[in-house]
Amino acid sequence: MRRPPPLGPTTASGPEGNVRNLRKRQAPGPGAAGGCGPEAGGRGENRQKRRMVARATPGRGEVKSDKSVAASGAGKAARRRVEGRRGQVSPSDRRGLEAAKEAEFPLQTERHTKEKRKVTEASSDDPQPGFDLVRKESLTSSESFQTVECLRSLGKEGIVEGIKRRIRNKKLKSLENPPLKITENEATQNIKVEFQDELYKNTLKYSCNILSPEVENNFVFKLRDCNCFPHSKDCNDENNLPYEPDGGCMHVAENFSKKENFRSLAEKSDTNNIPQLLQTEENVMGVNKLLPEESDLYQSKINGLLPCLQREKNKYSIEESSVGRKPRKRMKLSEKADETVTQMNFSNEYNKSELMLQENQMIADGKEAEAKSPLNVLRKVSHNTVSLMDHLLSVPEMVEKETSSEHHVNAVFQKTIEPLLKEETENASEPLGYENMALKEDFKSKSCIGKSPEYHIERRSSREDLRSDSEELKLSCQRTIPMTGKRTWPYYSCARISAWCWKKASLPESSYFLPGSQKSCKKVDVPKHQTNKTHLTDSKLLLQSSLTETNTESSSKEKLDSNLNCLFSVSAVEHTLMVIKEPIIKDDKKIKSEELSRSGSEVISNTTEDTQLTSDTQSLTGNKKRDRGNLTKLNLTAASKDGQEANNSTGKTIHRKACVAKQTFVVPDLVKILNTGRLTNFKIPLLKNKTKKRKEVNAKSSEREGYSPLELLDNLSGADTRQNRSKENVSMTMLGPQTLSIQNSVTPVQASSDSFYNKNSCSISPSFTKHGNSSKPSNHFSEPGNIVSNKEVASLTVENNAFSCDPGYVEKSPSFCCNKQETFRPVSSEVRGRKITKNFSEVGFPDILKAYEDDVLLIDVIQDDPDLFGVSNEGELSFTSEVPRISQEPNVPGEHQSTDSKYVETPVKKEPSDDLRELPVLDCGPIKPDICASNSAASEIKHDPKDANTSLGEVANETSENETLGDFSEQIKGSDLDEKHRFTDKVITKEEKENIYEVRKSKDSRNADIMVGECQFAAPVPKPLCLLVPPLNLSGHQEDTILNTWMNDFRFLGKHSVLKLQNPETCEIFKREKNVGVFQKSLGLMIPYKYCKFHFNTLRGCERPLCKFAHVPEQGDEKVCMDVFKKYININELCLLQRAVNVFMEYYRKFPPGIYFDLQVLNDLLNSLLKHCLLKEVFQIVNLSIMVKMLPSLKILLNIFEHVATMKLRNAVPALIDIFCKLVEAGMVLDPEHFNYIVKLLYQVQASKQEITAVLEMKSRLQMRQFKKNWKCDLDSALNKLEHCKEKGDWTKLGKLYINVKMGCEKFADFQTFCACIAETLTKNCEDERPDTPFCEFAETVSKDPQNSKVDKGVLGRIGISAMYFYHKLLQWSKGRKVLDKLYELKIHFASLKGLIGPEKLASRCQIVNVAAEIFLKSGSLDGALWVMRESEWIIDTPLWPCDRLDVLNRHNLLCTIAHETLAKSLYRQTFEVLQNLPGFQNSQETVEVSQYSLLFNKLLGSCIESNSLGMSSSVAEFMISKSIPIDFSFLRRLITSLGRSRLWLKARAHYKSALSLGCYPPLEGNLYRKLLLIPSYLSEIEMLLAIEIFMVSNASSIQSPGTSTQILQIVLKRCEDNQSRSNDDYQAAVERLIMAARISDPKLFVKHMTVNVNKEQVYSLEHCSALKWLKENMKWAGKVWLFSNH
């Protein structure tokens, strides 16, 4: 394989060059390099294929993201080559690697500066703790950078021209987009800028030419093979690729130097995708060579850590046997390296962590004997982490944003952590110390800060690399041993090891810091190592805080610190994201960081980090199991070991898990986005072709990753987003405002990560569960937080890396769990899942069921085993102790099922499930969740059927809850404290226990796999599946662990699994049902198919959020309800009784009781509820039973009162009294002693007086009702008594008889008959001699009844009408008057009633009123007659009350009679009222002629005028004029004169005007306008004045116009023709009246006598001045009155 000329160490200046020399001298050992074993050849072929593919697809390199992807792919290819040559690395390769590393540092620096420019969010002032010394020097030395750049560019010349064109295009693009901001020191920034410029130029020139096709192929292969791919992406150095063959070293370099290079070269990698990747590989190789000692030390440390972890595993897990050899090898290596590690603590530690990660990747890829080695496992984990990083990096913008934010966070974190790092360095193991030193140096040097942008760039590239690595990891995460033909998985296998646990841990924390961490990740290409350190520091801080919480601060801190060192090394892969996120997250800040991590950038970085941690954690799990005392420390160490060497600190792992959880929220989205595009190619190959498929997948993944993250986002956002649902993508996008690229990529990544996450969570969960159970489930569950941390950690890790979660490890560290609890937030482990999903989708999957069929390891667990269910090290109740079946029993296959069902019923679990809604896992359906589920299921089974089951169900659920990580502590508390919602020991029935126990004992691995798979499948389902487990009492961490289960078992193969689900949702439901069937024991009910058998026929019920089967019986299936109630009552479990209440309420609210309704079942149900103190449910059922008229027994009512009295439930008394009253009203019969007993109980409860009075009132009413029922309404006997009363004339007794009959008669018809008999008795055969009126006595007796009602009044009124008619007929006016008076007294409105018997029964209302009025008139009561008329509203004939003409005539005569009587009494108003209501005035339809009433009205008018009742006279006149009733003009004139004299001028003028219209006065004709007024001499002065006013107003214009003063207004006092016989005295009086009229006027008018005309009529003139003055003062009103008509 041709590789470009080595750059040589001279390119680097200062300590950088020295470090490189050291690396050269220290040739990577077989552990560092990592032998590929049998797969080496295959990988080589794959690399060649990949080269060909990369050549064929130059378009991918056109995008920056593609470049980064290509770079990562190249890095992977190089690593693969190196791994293939493990132990066969040639000196030239080493030199190439060394040169590549040397060149990589400056490139990274330059890239870092460029990245800083682009990412304004990242601040140069923020210290980057993860930077290496070499990196710092490279940053400070601009010349060395340039030299390295040139060398790299020379190395790039070997690339194919096609690649060159792509690189050039990319380069141009990158050049077009210069860095936006340089945050580092000016000097460093300038150097970086210059270096970048040179790099760009060189890249343009040499990028395509330097690299040979062979190198290109290697690049592609390396992308598949190693996690370096992300780094190579960042570096995009062609030189790195040729030196990539040293996979182990490269991988370490990748983590360390590549990170730097990635940062500095991220942009270059965009322009020079493949060449830069090659350079990255070379740089990595170079770095490995330069730091061979460090790498060796690192590997040895890792080896030491691994053995320790393995020893722990041997103690606590059964898996140790399969991995025993590997731990031993690692122990040897670690022992050898421990001595050197002390010296090289800082750099070596970091390198070692990277080496371990690389080795883990190599192991995953090779899956051979070497793969079995712990170092290989760690390396594999690192690879996986890098792959995740590659994925993250594939989205450049996202990465940049994430990097910037992360960088900032790192700075803050460094500041805060620096003292802690110091302490940790002292307390921690050498690896930890090394990392702490690195962190310190990073904090101290500003150049490190300058490198932080590089670190961010590196992170971008590492993300892309992570993509390719994740694909490889998918292969590598597959069983390491299966490659050898064995079915069992080693401890270090991702499937067995919950490598994802650390991922979860870091994910939560990093999630909190996601925005910043993403940015920092981008910056951390070189600072990745630093970032890892920082992460370790963060983890350390988190661990410390958690230790403080767990009261094991001192000891745990030291252990955690040491462990944290390992974690930090591992976190090197994870980068600053986790570290930064963790420090920020810590406790309260962690939540915020989680939210930030959700933005997507942190998620990405967390995913990478988490993956590494997971791998280490897995390897550590076994050792943790060995020593409980060391469990916490070992677990922490395992976590750190997964991240770095897995030896240092479980506490770190915890922190990382928290960070991972945080990151997971965002990362799943990004992963989902990135993975979405590859989901279509997601296939699961058979195990047999595992190696080949891996290679193919690696080649494909490298090609795929060749695309830039942006391209992936663009291409995948459409299809993947559509497939994986834009919901999660949207959420991730919202979280990712920090970086646009992250936001964009988040959508596809989320989609893909959802499906993958679901799958991964299942697979990881098993491994985690297994380890956790073996190690110490009690620790895992020791605290709600601890328990959660174990499982959640795994699940979180799954989200980020799907390979780096170690459930066992997580469980081992209770302190870690505590920290993790704090750390865990709604971190989207699904983000990790998403990223992993993308990688997995690129890789094929083997036949899961077959693969795991023989590999399943069933562990017989004692339910009361203190190790599994005991108290945590912290001394707190283990989470499992409160919810053993939920957390730990789920660890068993049966437990998983129980967990699955439990989560639904557990409200706390449901709360996490709410968060799960956001998890991509829910959206995993389109991603072939069946495959993921099956893989995860198999993995879980392998790890430990118990743990696997728990992790399967719980992982999915916990993963969902991880979304709710922020609330996981509360959820845990709720689960621990809320017995109702949690399936506590009390709630869990014996049947459940037996089921769980049976499941644990189950040795059928196939069944276990199926169950796990089903659970996993359920998890992928968008809503129901994911929610299946989360509702369990599992804490947020446990939920994360569940997600990790997916990752653990998940295989990174691009092919679909053999189990292809046509409908993922259906398959998931089916499998879930199958699982439930296995785990839950049927209650023995025969439930129709259409109803959910889990809801009705299991103790825990249905856990599906959305169940396609009915949970409430339909109409007609009442028998099913009764059967269910009977069964639930017999079992007498609280949960079942509550479910029975729900079913009862839901069914009988919709449907009435039918023939199958059993009242005894209702009573039994109420009794059972009372026994369980479910008083609220009792009230609900009783109220509903009253509504449906199915009353419970009296005994139940008394029992309720007794319960309330016994429990002193004073607040329940009002509701109970209300129910009691309803029951009595509904027909419940109580004896007096029952009432007395109830009152006694109420006194015991200190009920209020009103409440007791209410009971007593109900007693009286009940007695009356009982009397009614006891009274036999014998009509004959009643009638006999009635006759007896009639004979004796005892009308009072008759009234009592009426009351009794009324109370006892059940038929209203009989009652009416009896009333009619009473009416006849009261009206007939009444002797005239007797003055009394029977009706009055009878009515008096009835009215005295206290229960007298309107009905009684109506009956009395009708009987009174009959009596009235009787007396009217007999002309017995006095008796009739008495009847009417009694009705009036009783306020009975008989006018609207009819009689009971005789003609009055059909009489009209008018007739009844006429009869009554006539009786009053005949009896001399005019007021009575008027009262009757008024009560009847003077109604005569209306449509509602029709009557015949005879009734109308009778009314007319009656009213006229009344009018005469009133008028005779001078009752003018009453008379006028009567006349107004004569027939013909009320209804226009009446045909009565009203003119016939003229005499009556004129008589009334005359009477009024005579009596000087001017008001009434005026009203009568107006009414007559309005109704056109002829009016007597004499009366009208008299009225006008009287009004005028009374100074009532308005009415006088109105009537005068009306009189003119009626012709009362001669017409004025045209004289008015001729200035001549003719006034009859018979007019009164008032009438004359009114005539003069009209005259003046009519001539007002003439009078008021100037020049008309000479005009004369003449008034002629006209003699009447009929007045000729009159004497002259009358005429002379008229003259005087005229003069008086002029004087009456206001102002006065002056009339002058002018002459006498021929007719001897006096002619007068109206003085002009007086008329003008009058008009001025009165013209306004006069004009309106006289000029305008009123009508």
Curated annotation (Swiss-Prot):
InterPro entries named among the record's database cross-references: TOPAZ1, TOPAZ1_dom
Location, primary (coarse class): cytoplasm
Basic and acidic residues biased stretches: 80-113, 897-916
Polar residues bias spans: 598-622
Keywords of the record: Cytoplasm, Differentiation, Spermatogenesis
Annotated region (Disordered), positions in chain: 1-131, 319-339, 596-632, 880-916
Keyword Oxidoreductase: no
UniProt keyword Repeat present: no
Compositionally biased spans, kind Gly residues: 31-41
Protein origin, superkingdom: Eukaryota
Cellular localization per UniProt: Cytoplasm, Cytosol
GO annotation, biological process: cell differentiation; spermatocyte division
Gene Ontology cellular-component terms listed: cytosol
Stated role: Important for normal spermatogenesis and male fertility. Specifically required for progression to the post-meiotic stages of spermatocyte development. Seems to be necessary for normal expression levels of a number of testis-expressed gene transcripts, although its role in this process is unclear.
Full protein name: Protein TOPAZ1
Provenance organism: Macaca fascicularis
Protein's gene: TOPAZ1
